[in-house]
Amino acid sequence: TGIKGSVLNPLGQMVAEQVRVRTPYPLPPDRLLGIFDDLAAKLPAADRVTVGMPGMIRHGRVVSTPHYVTKRGPHTRVDPKLIEQWRNFDAQQAVAERLEMPAIVLNDAEVAGAGAVTGFGFEVVFTLGTGLGCAIFDDGHLLPHLEVSRAPVRRGRIYDTYIGDAARKRLGHLA
């Protein structure tokens, strides 16, 4: 998995090469904020920041995040201390204060979807990455998040087991 950054113009076009770092684990909130500092230092100045992160995010606060609470990354042992650090963490305020600019923090699939939807009618966006992402829009308005990736499918397994990055690695790129 990776944490990426760039700068966009008002039309949503990249005006800087994307910078990327491999997601380090474990990843408490302060460590993620430090990564944002490092990414911002490598990019041109911006007026505001949008962060998309995995999990349930409500009004910029982390309800839950499936991967950042693990000791060694997705599908590894969960660290109860990290769960507590992330629970109800006001990521939006922390990012705004750290980078000294207005910030919005949403689920990563919602951020991707905002750049892809037409704004007409009911639109559902699915993203495939570390896990399955989902965003739902009605006439361009973002609807409350549905964390599909963690839903049980069968035999106690979740969707991420079957169609996330772990499945891609298991099956291969062309499966």
Whereabouts are the PLM-identified features?
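Fold-independent oxyanion-binding glycine-rich loops
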Residues: T1, M53-P54, N107-A109, L128-T130
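Short beta-strand scaffold segments in enzyme catalytic cores
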Residues: I3-L8, G55, L132-D138
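Short, well-ordered, mixed-charge alpha-helical segments that flank or form enzyme active sites
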Residues: H59, A112-A116, G133-I136, P144-H145
